[in-house]
């Protein structure tokens, strides 16, 4: 019977488990478990999240400050964010430390170079000094680095503002989603508690119906006991009639007929009771199978005993003692059956008491869970109010920070305007210094006879170059384009000036030297002719030659034009033309023009 009680308890637990839902949900705020697509709670939670818009917070930005940043930042890509987050320090510490400020400008310049499609900066390790890294840059890269170094404060503040805004938006959205998720979980818990209460009431009703059925079985058992007692009385009457059997055979037969009818009615009543008991036991499922077996065994025993009793009554004349023994055995079987029925009744009452205790414990547990849930709801409400107050204070601090940032951007705008004006003036002064030096260099290069003739043209070209450079500084706003145009203009002027200097130096002819060489050749010829005249036999004829006319006829017009008009032949040559070449060279006067 101990095994039978365990089976009954197991049956009750199976009923409770089958009635309860199979899906469990997490009570935590930040549960990472996700249900399937068919889960209604997850779908309702997703719908609730879609119905509520995400929190967003736009930072107040001055238009002038934004325009200043757009000149240097093409877009806030991940490279710029990594350059800011790589320092792991705030703008205050970065700006205060010169080394971190230079390294931050290095990272920003590298990002700008990469975005513009140019080769990246050379590698600069974290432990190396920035001075050694800056030596690896050329002039153009160093200029870009200088621009970013001057605007490090503005860029750092803007990046820090965007990072702070994104962090606040993420925290507020997570807070809102967590609150919404907690509210949905509380709704789910409330529905679960309602379902649990309904299940408990259903279990209570089922146990009540089970109690009613057990009472019906008890009443049927009492009826069966009454029938059995009536049957025993009838057997006593039969025994009395058996004593008087000798008196009247007909009365005995009538008694036998009555006994048969009574037994038949008892059997019918017993079968009806057995049918009702079997129906009740079927409804109790597997827990009452043993009861059904015992009742069937009892019915079989009773039917067997009744058949034996009927057979003994047929032979009652000869087997009276055997009939009495059978009746005694029948009484013993009835006593055993009554004991079994009493045990069944006692077991059913114990099962009902245990079920009532279980329901009471379930009710107390549900009440405790509801009280705990109410306390958790109050705590969640307090936390939600506290977070709401914190978010309001954070928003107020953000508004104050935006106002300070706007004022700072206005001051930086004025500072940048002053810086641009000073830079323009310094570039103009630098250009005038360079062109003054260019004037001096041109003067030095054109001081010779070969290049003296191109000095005016070079000065005119230098003035035109200066005018073009000043115009580019005044009317071109892009710094890089200004530098490119200035370098192009200066390069063109230097190329043209060098070409003119080379052409003048290579194409120059010194006509004084040419005239001097021609005169030297003529003097040599005259001396040769004079020496030949002395050796000639016809000395008189030769002496009559007019050498002056010969020189005039022998020289061309071009040579006459190239001769010095102010030069006069010395008297010594006229009187004595036959002289040495060394004397002629010594008397020739190279006067400047």
UniProtKB/Swiss-Prot annotation:
Disruption phenotype: Embryo lethal when homozygote. Residues 25-427, 477-485 are extracellular. Keywords: Cell membrane, Coiled coil, Membrane, Signal, Transmembrane, Transmembrane helix. One of its GO terms (molecular function) is identical protein binding. InterPro entries: GEX1/Brambleberry. Residues 449-457, 507-593 are cytoplasmic. One of its GO terms (cellular component) is plasma membrane. In tricellular pollen, expressed in mature sperm cells. Not expressed in bicellular or unicellular pollen. Detected in ovules, roots and guard cells. Expressed in the embryo sac before cellularization, in the egg cell after cellularization, in the zygote/embryo immediately after fertilization and in the pollen vegetative cell. This is Protein GAMETE EXPRESSED 1. It comes from Arabidopsis thaliana.
